[in-house]
Design a protein with these regions (language model features):
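Conserved N-terminal phosphate-binding loop of PLP-dependent enzymes in the Aspartate aminotransferase
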Residues: 1-210
């Protein structure tokens, strides 16, 4: 996306996967010790720090990718004001916003997708894991801005659109994508929070939904 843009920014303590490029995108040194060479072009900034983000953005920056809740990094929930400021900054500078919802998507946070809790609309969203309810599936969703960039057959996969897996995903969405189900997620999350905060030795509980 964009001419000569070959750099992307992710956040420290993020986790984006275990393939070579997603390991490069992951902002944790512990995951950078075993597989080489990594895909080049990734820079990292501290979460909830716009000055740190702006310091690593350049005219080569294509996208900023983030997890709204950093799971592997310690269940760090990004500050809503930071996220909104980040999205506005990226929109103003024609930088794509990618939200990795592999661990937070499909009802886990009390909304169908976690970014709905923040009132933002990313340019690209990745979803997997719970979407297949145990069956292997991954989805990359993009908006109008990328319709001419990610055209049919641009990306492919041996297992893509497996009919059994897609049928499973349809069932999951039919079950999860309704207000009553999602309200129960938040209700149960609040129940666990109330119980856990009463246990001696637990200093704090961080959650969004379940």
């Amino acid at each position: 996306y964009g001419e000569c843009r070959n750099e992307n920014v992710t956040l420290n303590n993020s986790f984006h996967g275990r393939t070579v490029t997603t390991l490069a995108a992951t902002g944790q040194d512990v995951f950078h010790n075993y597989f080489f060479p990594f895909t080049e072009g990734f820079k990292y900034a501290d979460a909830d720090d716009m000055d740190a983000l702006k310091a690593v953005v350049s005219d080569k920056t294509c996208a900023v990718m983030l997890e709204l809740i950093q799971g592997e990094g310690g269940v760090n929930i990004l500050d809503p004001e930071y996220v909104k400021e980040l999205v506005k900054y990226c929109n103003d500078n024609d930088i794509l916003v990618i939200v990795d919802e592999v661990q937070t998507g499909v009802g886990r946070t009390g909304k169908l997708l976690a970014h709905q809790n923040y009132g933002i609309l990313p340019d690209l969203i990745t979803v997997a894991k719970v979407l297949g309810c145990g069956l292997p599936i991954g989805v990359c969703m993009c908006g109008e801005k990328l319709k001419d960039v990610m055209s049919p057959s641009t990306h492919g996969t041996t297992f893509g659109a497996n009919p059994v897996v897609c049928a499973g995903a349809n069932y999951v969405l039919d079950t999860v994508a309704n207000d009553e189900f999602l309200a129960e997620v938040e209700k149960k999350g609040q129940y666990f929070e109330d119980k856990l905060t009463k246990i001696d030795g637990i200093k704090s509980v961080r959650r969004m939904g379940l």
